[in-house]
Regions:
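Iron-sulfur-associated redox domains of electron-transfer enzymes in respiratory
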Residues: 1-156, 162-165
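Short secondary-structure subsegments characteristic of cysteine-rich extracellular domains
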Residues: 168-170
Length: 170
């Protein structure tokens, strides 16, 4: 888990918050299951935040499941969503959160994402210092061929990666 102070710094002045937990790995790791979602909700409300909606995705790292989990989050006028999963799950939530800021509650160490049955794509190295809350849900450590954290390298052209011009610059 991230230190609560770090999470609260990301949440900042947001008042209306949604929380998404993960029924799979994060539940098994006690970092984002129903118990932890309830604990975070209670903490946020004690800090004067309004937790408008919570949900549990079977797997936060599966886009199709996350889409269904986030349906109740739509039209709630949320200021942000907190993803209580691995960094990969937070990225899936961010892709489906209707452009709301999504903040990670955990510092993930490693993982990949199921693109389709039997095909996996590395999307998070669980580096232990998750920056997805600052990068719009894009992990520069895994999605940049050079793992740059300070912006594009000098070799990118027209928003394309220097190492593999087929890929967009992270």
């Amino acid at each position: 888990k991230k230190p609560i102070e770090e999470l609260m710094a990301m949440v900042g002045d947001a008042k209306r918050i949604g929380i998404v937990g993960c029924s799979s790995c994060a539940t098994a790791c006690a970092t984002g299951g129903p118990k932890e979602v309830a604990e975070l909700k209670k903490y946020l409300e004690a800090q004067g935040k309004e937790v408008v909606v919570t949900g549990m995705a079977e797997y936060c790292c599966m886009n199709l499941g996350v889409k269904g989990t986030l349906k109740p989050f739509q039209d709630k006028n949320l200021d942000c969503v907190i993803g209580m999963s691995c960094g990969d799950g937070v990225q899936c939530v961010a892709k489906n959160a209707n452009n709301k800021p999504v903040y990670p509650s955990n510092n993930t160490m490693y993982l990949g994402e199921a693109v389709k049955f039997g095909v996996w794509e590395e999307s998070c190295r669980f580096c232990g210092d998750c920056v997805l809350g600052k990068t719009g849900g894009i992990c520069p450590v895994t999605q940049c061929a050079k793992s740059l954290m300070n912006g594009p390298c000098g070799g990118q052209k027209n928003g394309k990666c220097e190492v593999d011009p087929e890929n967009p610059c992270a």
